Amino acid sequence: MKFDILTLFPAMFDGPLTESIIRRAVERGFVDISLHNIRDYATDRHRVVDDAPYGGGDGMVMKVEPLAACIEAVKAERPAARVILTTPRGRRFDHDAARELAGYEELIIVCGRYEGIDERVRDLFVDDEFSIGDFVLTGGELAAMVMIDAVIRFIPGVLGSPGSAEYDSFADGLLEYPQYTRPVEFRGVQVPGVLLSGNHAEISRWRRQKALELTRRVRPDLLHKAELSSSDRDCLAMLEREGEP
């Protein structure tokens, strides 16, 4: 999968895109990531990429010409690439959105800055817009990093275990169950006995119940769209009767 990131601050991506799973994905040829400095496409001697907004107001707006030139240069090499803009105005980026974007072979991610971009960039070039939450960041670079990390997890072969992405939190609409590893006891706190039993059916049942409990307590809104079986609903009803928080 090919990612082209359009940004005013390419150095911000050192580290997040050069370590851990993303680094291994690049080294193994599953992912190709290129950074493009929008400022390189400014045509004036001072390489200006922003200007005051028409109509007045605070802050500056990213100019259309450098952005257009940068997008067109990348699209000339990858005409089928989907152009994504990171912006608070976008639709919510979540587990399903990450899976959706993983279905594309080429993505161009435009990182917004300042008070936003000239609207004509949206009108002429952008295919989709995403926001990672109801808050404002200094720029779209951090959002782009989050999105790339989440999308890459769905690329076959990237994760060590083929089922890892499918068992993550949100994969089936629920938060993930609690995880434990050695030692069995730490400062008086024991690993639940069922996880040591070797009974895979009981372990699966325990994990599902804990996922339901956690989701009900922390993110009850997720239950409205989760894929719940009749036994899941029975478990939730039992928790309600027992007054579990």
Curated annotation (Swiss-Prot):
Positions binding S-adenosyl-L-methionine in this chain are G112, I132, G133, D134, F135, V136, L137
Q: Does the keyword Transferase apply?
A: yes
Q: What is its EC number?
A: 2.1.1.228
Q: Which family does it belong to?
A: Belongs to the RNA methyltransferase TrmD family.
EC class of the enzyme, as a word: transferase
Q: Does the keyword Metal-binding apply?
A: no
* Subcellular localization(s) per the UniProt record: Cytoplasm
GO-annotated biological processes? tRNA N1-guanine methylation
Q: Which UniProt keywords apply?
A: Cytoplasm, Methyltransferase, S-adenosyl-L-methionine, Transferase, tRNA processing
- What name has this protein been given in UniProt? tRNA (guanine-N(1)-)-methyltransferase
Which GO molecular function annotations are given, in alphabetical order? tRNA (guanine(37)-N1)-methyltransferase activity
Q: Which reaction does it catalyse?
A: guanosine(37) in tRNA + S-adenosyl-L-methionine = N(1)-methylguanosine(37) in tRNA + S-adenosyl-L-homocysteine + H(+)
Query: Can you list the GO cellular component terms from the UniProt entry?
Result: cytosol
Q: Which InterPro entries match?
A: Alpha/beta_knot_MTases, tRNA_m1G_MeTrfase_C_sf, tRNA_m1G_MeTrfase_TrmD, tRNA_m1G_MTases_N, tRNA_MeTrfase_TRMD/TRM10
- HAMAP family, alphabetically? TrmD
Q: How does it assemble?
A: Homodimer.
Protein's job: Specifically methylates guanosine-37 in various tRNAs.
